[in-house]
């Protein structure tokens, strides 16, 4: 499938709203479900998705509550709620077991889904996720609160983050167009409510990893600006999940976009070992 073509959007109706997704519909091994980070869309995987499908995998990408082509206003935007959406999507598609991958905020969602429904999850992948972070101190909480307020009231700040921080190395050829789309999406009526729901949620829950029994892979960009010491965070997550760890040299917070080939190689090796 040509990665430059937009996949066909399908929808799952749930209590409270509608979730958008796409599905290649065929492939070898357990299907792979890719979840974007907060305030993003499933197009975050536009460069990784074709590499996985070219390798023969069935790939499903899903928009989160409030963003992409999903319904905008929900009563809950938490990682746990998103975990429930993923499991509902598996039911909807008649999938018994899948590999779940989550970036950033939704790393917690795939961990929660694996703990809640171990029989449904063949493996999990954390892509620069916030799971099992060291709890922030008082000053850090103040800084995070200020940043959250900026995101809610100033979509341009989200654009600044993507243009100046999130991609410390190479940027995708379509980067500027993509970032402009992210900023425009935040200005859609109702998105302020959705943004507030995400920035006030617990994106880094601790303790959830204890319930995970499936194989896990931790992928981390070596230059992720969201973490002072990215490899230390990856080590903590890998230890909590008894997981394989892969550092993507030079990658930022979105390795599937700035280093898609290296990210695909890490995922495909993990998937091969699950067979």
Located regions from the model:
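Alpha/beta-hydrolase fold catalytic core
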Residues: 1-32, 54-57, 95-96, 122, ...
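Conserved loop-alpha-helix segment in the C-terminal half of the alpha/beta-hydrolase fold
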Residues: 217-251
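Conserved alpha/beta-hydrolase catalytic His-Asp/Glu region
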Residues: 135-137, 153-211
